[in-house]
Each structure stands twice: as C-alpha cells, then as structure tokens.
Amino acid sequence: MSGAGANYWIARLLAVIAGLLGALLAMATPFLPVNQNTAQLNWPQNSTFESVEAPLIGYVATGLNVTVPCAAAAGLTGPQSAGQTVLLSTVPKQAPKAVDRGLLIQRANDDLVLVVRNVPVVSAPMSQVLSPACQRLTFAAYFDKITAEFVGLTYGPNAEHPGVPLRGERSGYDFRPQIVGVFTDLSGPIPTGLNFSATIDTRYSSSPTLLKTIAMILGVVLTIVALVALHLLDTADGTQHRRLLPSRWWSIGCLDGLVITILAWWHFVGANTSDDGYILTMARVSEHAGYMANYYRWFGTPEAPFGWYYDLLALWAHVTTTSAWMRVPTLAMALTCWWLISREVIPRLGHAAKASRAAAWTAAGMFLAVWLPLDNGLRPEPIIALGILLTWCSVERAVATSRLLPVAVACIVGALTLFSGPTGIASIGALLVAVGPLLTILQRRSKQFGAVPLVAPILAASTVTAILIFRDQTFAGESQASLLKRAVGPSLKWFDEHIRYERLFMASPDGSVARRFAVLALLVALSVAVAMSLRKGRIPGLAAGPSRRIIGITVTSFLAMMFTPTKWTHHFGVFAGLAGSLGALAAVAVASAALRSRRNRTVFAAVVLFVVALSFASVNGWWYVSNFGVPWSNSFPKLRWSLTTALLELTVIVLLLAAWFHFVATTNGSAKTRFGVRIDRIVQSPIAIATWSLVIFEVASLTMAMIGQYPAWTVGKSNLQALTGQTCGLAEEVLVEQDPNAGMLLPVSTPVADALGSSLAEAFTANGIPADVSADPVMEPPGDRSFVKENGMTTGGEAGNEGGTNATPGINGSRAQLPYNLDPARTPVLGSWQSGIQVVARLRSGWYRLPARDKAGPLLVVSAAGRFDHHEVKLQWATDSGAASGQPGGAFQFSDVGASPAWRNLRLPLSAIPSMATQIRLVADDEDLAPQHWIALTPPRIPQLRTLQDVVGYQDPVFLDWLVGLAFPCQRPFDHQYGVDETPKWRILPDRFGAEANSPVMDNNGGGPLGVTELLLKATTVASYLKDDWSRDWGALQRLTPYYPNAQPARLSLGTTTRSGLWNPAPLRH
C-alpha cells in the first residue's frame, strides 16, 4: 500500500467494515424471521348447519381435520330428506368436477361415503352409521397422506381384515381436497361434536419482525456508508469532480421535440401490451392482500423476486387506475431512454456519431420503432430497457474516469433491472462486457489501497437488492414459489427459444408488422455493426471500447433471453434503448466515410427493403381493444399485387441497381448539385428512412382508428376523455341488457305464442334445436367439436348460452333452454334442426309493431342459434298498408356477433330502418341440407340498455379477466386476504379469441381464479353491446350466481406468529 493510501485509512476501514457488514446483512435478510398472519377456517358457524364460502387462493389447506357425529347422518334419510345427499363438502355438489377436486361426505344409495378427489376413502352402510355402535366419522388430510375412520365400526366378516376398525388411508400422492367453503344440505341446530378445522396456507401473508427491520435498515445504511467511503477512495486520484450530467442535458433540439411529440401522442392513442390488465389487477389487489400475489396463476404465490416494480405501480394506482395515468411512469422512462441515448450514448461512441445527423435520426427512429409496439404498457420491459442503458452509462463512466463508485452504482442498477422481471436477465450483459477494463482499474487501484476496501463496497452494492426483494418474504417461501412456477409452467427451456421467433413470424399481434419490423431492424443494425467491426477492427470514426461494448451487450442480451421461462415477442421490448444505440452505430457504419462503395450501400438498401417487405407479410394487428378500428388489422388491401409483393419487387430492382454499380458504373462519382448531395445523403440512410416510415405508419394507423371509429370507443378516445374526468374507460361504452323480456316487440294481430311462425313455418318447429349448442372453437372448423373443455365447462364468453332443455315446455311448447334469461313462458322459439333426413326449412314470421322512434333504443336484436350465413336470416320492414297487403318495403341483414352454433344476439341498428317503417318481420331460409347447418330464432326485441358502469358499479367484486383489466379501471377486482378469495359477483371477459386463448391460463391446472369460481359459482352471460360499434365483439359480461345462494362468507380465526426464514408448513400443491 502506498503512502497516499495510508492517508485514507479511515475511508479504507469504513469501506471494509461497512461493505462486508452491509453485504452480510443483505444476504441474511431472506433467512431472518417474519411475522406471519395465521388463519383458521372453523365450522360450523352460528351453531347451525349453515353453508359458508371460503375459496382458498392456494386451493388446499396445509392441514384439515373433520369430525362428524354419526347421528348427523340421520338428516340424509327419510322422505323429508329427498334431494338432500351431502352431509358435508368442501365444494358445492352441483359444480362440475366437484367430486374430482373436493371432499364430499355424502349419501350414495344406502351408504355413507367419504370421497376425496374422486377416490372413496371409507364408506359404511347407513344402517350401521345410524346404529348405536357408530360414534363419529373422522377425517384428516395432510400433504403426505389422508386418513378417515368410522369410530366404533369394524369391517364385516366377509372383509379382507374382519374385525379391524373401519378406516381408510391414501398416500403416495397429495390428496388434499380443494376448499371453496363448507357446504351441507342439512339445516337446523348442529349435533354435539361436529367440527371442521382447516389451517389456511398464509405463508406469504407476512411482515418483517423488529429484528429483520433493524437488520434491513442497518444493511441499507452500511451500504450507503461503504459507497461514500469508496467515493472518498476514488478522489485519491487527484482529479477534479466531473459533471454528472452533460452540459446540454436540458437543452431541447428539433429532433428531441419530435421524439417527445411522438411519445406523448402515442401515450394517448397508442396500443398497449397484452399483460397490462394482468399487472394492473395485481397491483390494485396487493394492498388489501398484504403482498404482491400472482393473481391469475400459480395459486396466489408472490411475484417476488420480480415484484418490486409492480409495488411501485401499486403506489401509483392510489391516485387513479386509468390507463393514461398508470402509464405515466412508462412515458417518463421512454423520455429518459431517449435522453440517455442522445446525450450519453451517442457522444461516447465517438466524433463520427456525435457529428452525424444521420446517426441521431437513425437512433431516434430505431428507438421509436422498438418502443412504440413493445413498451407502451405496464410490463417491466420499459424499466429493463432503461436499466440496461443506465448500467452501460455507469460502466462507461467508470472506464472513462478510472473510478469504482460508478461500478457500484452499475451493480445496484443492474440488480434492480435483473429483478424487475424475468427478461431483466438481459442486464447481466452490461456488466459482463466490461469485465476486462474494470478488472484493470481494480488491479491498478488495489496497489494503492488493497483489494478488500475496493471490493467490499461493490459487494454490498451488488447484494443490497436482496433487502428489497425479501423485505417481507422468506427464503423458504420464495424457493417454494419458484419451484411451483417451474413445475406448473410455462417453463420453457433455453433450446425452445425458436418458439419466440416462430411467434414473431405468425400473422397475429405477436408477429404484427410493427413488432416484426422492430426485431428485424434491430438484427440488421446489429449485423452491420458486427460486420464492420470484424472487417476493420472497429467502425471508422467511432470509439472502439464503447461501440464494442454496445454490440457485446446486445449479443449477450439475445443469449440471455434464451433462459427466460416464457417465449413471447413482447420481451424484445428490453432492446429499445440498445436499438437506438445500435441505430447510431449502423448509421455511421453505412455512411460514405465508412462504406464508400455505392454498390455496398445499395445492397444495404436492398436488405432494408427486404426487411420491410418481410415485415408487411403480416397484419397490422394489436392486442384486444387496441385493435378496434385499426386499418388492415386482418390483412392489407390488394390491388394488382399485394403490398408485400410490391416491396419484394422493389427489393429486386434495387439489387439490380447494385449489380449495375458493380459491373457497369464501377466508379463512385460525387454529386455535383445541391439536390444530388441531398439525394446521396438520403440513400446513405436507408435504415433511418425505413424506421421513420414505420413509425409514421404506426402512429397514423392508431390515429386513423380513433378518428374513423368516432364516436365509438377506441383506446385513444378513452385516454383523451380521461383528461376531462371520464375515467371509466370501456365500462361507459358497453351497454347491458339486464332484462331482455322487457324489450320484446308485440305482434300486430297474432298471439305471442303463434306469431313467430304465423306466416310460414316449413320444417321450423318449437323443438327444432339440439340439446347442446356449445360454441365451436375459434381455431377449429365449424362443427368439428363444441367449444368446451374436457371437463364439460365452457371457457369463453357464452356461459349459459350453450343450450339445454327445460322440464316444463314454454309458451309455444318448446323445451329449449333460452339464453340471456329470456323467459320461456313469454318467449317462443322455432328451429330448423332435425335428425335423420334433412329437408329445406323456411320461416316467415308475423308482423311485429315498431314503437315510436323517440321512445325506442338504438338497436334491434334477435336471439339466434345455429350455423348459417348472414343472408339466410333477414328482417323485412313495411308500413301498415304494406304489411296489410303483404308488400314489405325492404329487407336488411343482421350483424352476427358471436360464436356459432351457440345462442347469440343478431343486431341491426334501428337507424338503418327507414323512419316510415311501422312493422317488421323475420325471414329465414335454411336450404343447406348439411346436418350441422340449422337456424333457431326468437322474436325481435329492442333492448332497454344501461351502461356496464351503471350495472356493475364501483363496489361489486368483479372477476376481471387479465386482458380486460386496463380497459375497466373503475370495476373493483375481487380481493384476497389471509389466503382466502373474495367471492366475485361478475366476470368480464375479452373478445372470443382472447377468452379462448387466455382462460386456460387461469384454470385449475395453472392455479388461477377460474379454478375457484367454476366450483363455487354458476356463470350466466348477460346480453351486452358496444355503443356505436354494434357489430364489435368487445367481450362479454357474466353474472356469477353461487350454487348455494344462502352461503355467507366464512368468519376466520386470525392470529399472528413468528416464522423462521426456513419454515415450510407443507409443499405447495399443484
């Protein structure tokens, strides 16, 4: 150690002690004890046979003990007990798959049977159960085994072990039953000894103990002290303090203004990402829950170690949950990224980049081309993109100044970025690529102070993030959660990375024009930068170190992305900041100073054109509501050639021009005129032209959608309206028909029961409807199979519309079960379905009276089922005289919104019908003799409509599917606390494609809320429509009705206890 080092002995001592202690406390944080909130579900409550609801978010209890006196089974016998079969169950007996997933103690014929997850554990004849010998039935369930016994009874003489106590046991599998409450068919006072006690898994409902709090505070303070000491050691080099921010940091140029304008406008009209509703709902519910649970999957386990960013969003949501407000941090990150690119990255790349306008414009175009389609939401990609840039800037400052405090800052930022989300793994590259220069600095400085005083603060900085991650959780809990997520999935391997690129080349929002171009342009810029660096050792005019590190970070980030457990294209959003930096590198690389050959520049232009052509071989599609009204969202228009073909042909022409330059015009003539100079400069920046063209295309597309759809709802309109105080989004535009019977039109001269087929009804009959009309899947041909899961439960928005039969015939003798709560006693129905020989069917209804237009709603609706073409069902209108003479004035086709053959509502705006019309009738022709082709109709009606906001309101607990959360900011997601979910009253689903794709994510296999609600509640679709966009499939509203309507929320026995960081009550069942 030198003499100068001896003068800093206090700083050295502080750096060593504070750094090592800070790191030790940070690493000890996961293992320190926490205060756990405990909860016990005990039943009976109120001393009566009263069913209670207690849907466990983790599905099962850590331990369950049940004791039932044998005398209690007497309530299941006798003529007065008809229909009463369940003595006790943890799931309603009416629920699909109740026997497969729950515990039921029930009467089966003349036996009392205890069944757990479809496995009979023990049973006894009712005669023996009610005999004096039988004392009680006991049951215990733990993760390793379940046991049940009829105390007092023994196996009979014909059994394998006669005289042995009548008991059963199952092990070798986690048989713990799912619990959504305690239900019984019995009533009245309870017998003595009846007891149900479940220990609810609340391992994640915890808070730090005083010891852990003190340790965390000391860990943070000591880390700060260590960093101050490291700064003092850095100052020993004798150099003066350098500005933290460049001198022109706050100045705004024309390009800055343009980028700010685009980002600000896109903030309002731009498309969002698919997971925004997922993340927003988690954030909204976390405060009441006490931790950031993964609300839609994985049995309520916490998001940690990736949840700290979502905690910030939870705080942000205290002001308002509107989209425009919740994404303000994202906008701030976008602006910060651009400021770093333009003021830190480009100047550090060297004089050629700093002096080149093409470099700045290309950097801006590349940055926007990636940011706009991938980062305009609540996902963590924006903060990861920013974190990567900040880490690189800190590393570059360390290399430039030969100081180590920036290294420590880079470690903190890198760790925060790493734990912002699974894709934060890309931040590792920012540190790895600079290991060589940083080790050189450390080696040089250690000669002066020794290695330990320099390394200890960096170690503390690298580990301090553990305090944030494990502040209220334990090592055991997080380890169990990570193992469960890996087991449940999705958990793809590194060699499955090809799936991400396969999705990128699908004609879907995942592989849309914008996303595909963003990634391909990034790869082109990276390829050019790598090629030039390999060919000449460096890109001429650029600083070798910083430019190589930018390239290295990008390459390592692509490699690191291989290890993320999911493979979605929105993960490419982490490259937004790097894309801008690479854009600057590529612009300099292809400039005339670096790439003098016109042939080579022309070939590069052809490559860029090919990338554009490949990008447009897709759709201009966006996720869910962001796609409303967007032009070419399904396909691009074709004139003589498709746009992709035209771009490909242009690519060939440019390649032929390059061949001309190679074989004929081999000299590089210089431009002689000012116009020629400008043309030459433009040709030298093809990637800038392409990126800015795509940016303009994207912004114009979403702006056109907002203007073209007006006054109908769009994302842009909703965000702009939020500035005026209209903050409820789509809930104010979805119109709900609560009572479809109230809007039914009356026939002019025929009884209601006969009017539907009074003019003509050939092969249309009251029972011409199959019993099952479940919808076909979106992705399968019509009629291939019904859109139901293997367990028989629908997953889309048509719950309650899949048909069935009634025991009592309706007004016209039909036994068909009608949708949307249509009353069969008031609503006739006719259908053309028939088994056996098929014949042509025709229907002409009687005339129905139209009400006065000023007293009618905006829409005319007919509930229909079947598979048919639009032209096969029509509405004819007439005046009174025209109807009397049988001369209709004209006809209209309906908009058929929904999935066939399920019941859905055919729609026709009332404004389309001439004002002179006073009567209407239905006309249907089924001339297709295919057995799966049929039509069923109910009478026309004009719905009485209220907004979804008025119907659902602010307070009712709602099951918001994860795609819809951002579009419905005023609806309250159902809460969970102490391991128990609140029972929702409504469910809001996305459009049919989204419902089919995403409902499986939330089902019982993944540990989501759908696996709870389908056992506890019956879903019925409520008719709804999107205002002024009547033919739009916006989604669906479902009313959730408990199978046991009188069941009340259970009262839990709460407590608090202290748990070690290694405590584990039981494995998480999955």
UniProtKB/Swiss-Prot annotation:
Keyword Glycoprotein assigned: no
Top enzyme category: transferase
Compartment(s): Cell membrane
GO terms of biological process kind: Actinobacterium-type cell wall biogenesis; cell wall organization
Bilayer disposition of the protein: Multi-pass membrane protein
UniProt EC number: 2.4.2.-
Origin: domain of life: Bacteria
Membrane-traversing stretches: 10-32, 210-232, 247-269, 399-421, 425-442, 449-471, 512-534, 547-564, 574-596, 603-625, 645-664, 685-707
GO cellular component: plasma membrane
Coiled-coil region: none
Keywords assigned: Cell membrane, Cell wall biogenesis/degradation, Glycosyltransferase, Membrane, Transferase, Transmembrane, Transmembrane helix
GO molecular function terms attached to this record: arabinosyltransferase activity
Primary site of residence: membrane
Protein family: Belongs to the emb family.
Summary of the function given for this chain in its UniProt record: Arabinosyl transferase responsible for the polymerization of arabinose into the arabinan of arabinogalactan.
Protein name: Probable arabinosyltransferase C
Species the sequence originates in: Mycobacterium leprae (strain TN)
Name of the gene this protein is made from: embC
